Amino acid sequence: MKPLVVFVLGGPGAGKGTQCERIVQKYGYTHLSAGDLLRDERKKPDSQYGELIESYIRDGKIVPVEITISLLQRAMERTMAFDANKHKFLIDGFPRNEDNLQGWERTMNGKADVSFVLFFDCDNETCIERCLERGKSSGRSDDNRESLEKRIQTYLQSTRPIIDLYEKRGKVRKVDASKSVDEVFTKVQNIFD
C-alpha cells in the first residue's frame, strides 16, 4: 500500500506542530516533521549529513531536497514496515520551495499519494510572538527575532508560491491559524471529518 500524504504548511509559529499532534490523536495519522527529522539527523554522531544540515539550519537556509526526501522516505518506510495499517502521514514543513516540490515529484511520483495541503494561514507578527514565546522553553536555536525574520522572508518568498501552486490544483485546505488552539482545531476537524 502506498503512503497517503497530507502536506502541512504555514509560517514559523503558525501552529503546525500543535495541530498535527491533535490530528494524530484523533485521526490516526503519523506526523513527520521535516524540520525535526533534519534536527535529529544533525545530532547523530555518525550521520553522513550532520554537519551539512547544521550549516544550512544555522544560516536559516533550506536544506538540499535530496537529504530531506531521503529522511522522509526512510521514516515512512520504517513506520509502514512496523505497522502496515499506518499508511497515513502528515508531513509538516515540506515542500518549502520549488526545488522541494520538484524533488518530491521526481522521487516520490507513484510511490506516495498527496491528498491535499493543509495550510495554516497566520499573520507574521502573531507567528513571531508565538515563536519568541516558544523559544523561551524550546531551546531551539532558531527561535530568536533575527532568525525568525529571515525564516519568515524565506517562507514568503519560497513556500507561499508552492501553496499558490497547489491552490491552482484545487488541493489546498486553508485554516485561519491566528485563533486559539481549540478554535483552529475545530476548523481542522471540519476538513478531516
Swiss-Prot record:
Tell me which residues bind a ribonucleoside 5'-phosphate.
Answer: 39, 61-63, 93-96, 140, 151
Q: Where is this region: LID?
A: 133-143
Write one Gene Ontology MF term: CMP kinase activity
Positions that bind ATP = 13-18, 134, 179
Per the record's keyword annotation, is ATP-binding included, yes or no? yes
Top-level taxon in the UniProt lineage = Eukaryota
Q: Name one GO biological process term.
A: CDP biosynthetic process
Q: List keywords of the entry alphabetically.
A: ATP-binding, Cytoplasm, Kinase, Nucleotide-binding, Nucleus, Pyrimidine biosynthesis, Transferase
Q: Which cofactor does it need?
A: Mg(2+)
Q: Where is this region: NMP?
A: 33-63
Q: E.C. number, please?
A: 2.7.4.14, 2.7.4.6
Entry's Gene Ontology cellular component terms: cytoplasm; nucleus
What is a single Pfam family found in this protein's UniProt entry?
Answer: ADK
Reactions that this protein is recorded to catalyse: CMP + ATP = CDP + ADP; dCMP + ATP = dCDP + ADP; UMP + ATP = UDP + ADP; a 2'-deoxyribonucleoside 5'-diphosphate + ATP = a 2'-deoxyribonucleoside 5'-triphosphate + ADP
Q: What is its main location?
A: nucleus
What does the record note about the cofactor?
A: Binds 1 Mg(2+) ion per monomer.
Task: Name the InterPro entries for this protein.
Answer: Adenylat/UMP-CMP_kin, Adenylat_kinase_CS, P-loop_NTPase, UMP_CMP_kinase
Q: Which residues bind CMP?
A: 100
Record note on domains? Consists of three domains, a large central CORE domain and two small peripheral domains, NMPbind and LID, which undergo movements during catalysis. The LID domain closes over the site of phosphoryl transfer upon ATP binding. Assembling and dissambling the active center during each catalytic cycle provides an effective means to prevent ATP hydrolysis.
HAMAP family in the record: Adenylate_kinase_Adk, Adenylate_kinase_UMP_CMP_kin
Q: Which family does the entry's similarity section mention?
A: Belongs to the adenylate kinase family. UMP-CMP kinase subfamily.
Indicate the quaternary assembly.
Answer: Monomer.
Under what name is this protein listed?
A: UMP-CMP kinase
Question: Which species does this protein come from?
Answer: Xenopus laevis
Gene name of this polypeptide:
cmpk1
